[in-house]
Amino acid sequence: MEHYKLKSNLIVFAAIVLSFIGCEAKPTESQIELALDKQVIEKPFSLKDYSEKDFDSIFIIYPYFDTNRKVFLNLRMSKKLKSLCNVNTGSELISTILFIKNSRVEAYTIIERKNADFASIDFEKQHLFPFDQKFIMDKERDVHIHSLYSE
């Protein structure tokens, strides 16, 4: 009887640990960087085109982004992911894209700027975009908001 009680306690503990692990945002959208590497120049695209999941919005963190800004601090995510974002902002080689569902960061991906440079977007106006936002990439692989882009 004691053996079964211990076993059931271990199962409950394992279920709790797995549920916490499952709540952590994961880099599940890594296929997006691969797709962006092959993105046709001057052809409109959205990140939704490359994702198997459905999110409400995306938040783009460019190099040297100030993670003390209110717009970032208001995002619901784990401390571990916030820490990762803080580290990533120190590199000018990457941008981090957060995928948001129901006001919570559910996934992220790290994009090398040589593949797609989101840092060329005017972030003084906006960091948060609808998931189906259309972008366009120029010859230098700089990404622009499609509706604001002119060749």
Predicted regions and their residues:
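Short, surface-exposed beta-strand/loop "edge" segments at domain boundaries and coil↔beta transitions
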Residues: T67-N68, V105-A107, H144-I145, E151
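C-terminal partner/receptor-binding element of secreted or periplasmic proteins
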Residues: N115-E151
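A mature extracytoplasmic/lumenal domain signature
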Residues: Y64, K101, I110-N115, D122
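Short, structured surface segments that line ligand/substrate-binding pockets
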Residues: N86-R104, T109
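Sec-dependent bacterial lipoprotein signal peptides
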Residues: M1-I21
